[in-house]
Regions:
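Short, low-complexity disordered leader/linker segments with a strong preference
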Residues: 1-27, 92
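Short, solvent-exposed loop/turn and secondary-structure capping segments
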Residues: 40-43, 83, 110-111, 134-135
């Protein structure tokens, strides 16, 4: 996963002149919910990205000896306006790509309102909404986690393989709950 992330970033950076705006450094954004409902998960996600950036920088072979400077922003996971503002701040600060965001709703808002209009690549490690599969991204949005639609199909198949004839579905009444457990599983199980 780490090598894939580095490879995608390097490929994208090779086509952008903004990558070298401060000499040798390449500014990369990390936007995750450092505050909010998943704040306990995000430090490890950010540290993983920063470690990948460090390894790429320390190799000495990143685009002729360039290094990556990580810049963090808080998506909050829950507040799309705050996440978009944070992402725009990173973009205004010169980042050429963003690792994040994390939660699907805020990821969609950041992609639609900040990253895509500014031509900044996003790679989300955890946004799983099926709607992101068909986002009009002009080639700027990627994710490493599969869509909830696929997860629902797999869960339904496992349930059917175990000869379960009926199920009761409970879920959190928000986009994540509906996508992940309600619609995707329910549609695939029927």
């Amino acid at each position: 996963m780490k090598k894939l992330l580095i490879g995608i970033f390097v490929f994208i950076l090779s086509f952008t002149s903004k990558a070298f705006s401060d000499g040798h450094g390449i500014k990369m954004g990390i936007i995750l919910g450092f505050t909010g409902p998943i704040e306990t998960l995000t430090p490890a996600m950010a540290a993983s990205a920063e470690l990948a950036f460090k390894e790429a920088s320390d190799s000495g072979s990143l685009l002729g000896g360039k290094y990556i400077k990580a810049m963090r922003g808080d998506s909050t996971c829950a507040d799309s306006a705050a996440g978009t503002t944070a992402a725009q701040g990173l973009i205004d600060g010169g980042v050429v790509a963003i690792m994040g965001a994390d939660c699907s709703g805020v990821t969609t808002a950041i992609a639609d309102n900040a990253a895509i209009p500014n031509g900044v690549v996003m790679i989300s490690p955890s946004a799983t909404s099926p709607a992101l599969t068909s986002i009009n991204d002009n080639g700027y949005f990627f994710r490493t986690a599969p869509s909830d639609a696929r997860g629902g199909e797999i869960l339904a198949k496992i349930t059917k393989d175990r000869k379960v004839k009926s199920v009761a579905i409970t879920y959190t009444n928000n986009d994540y709950g509906k996508d992940c457990n309600g619609d995707c599983f329910g549609d695939a199980f029927i």
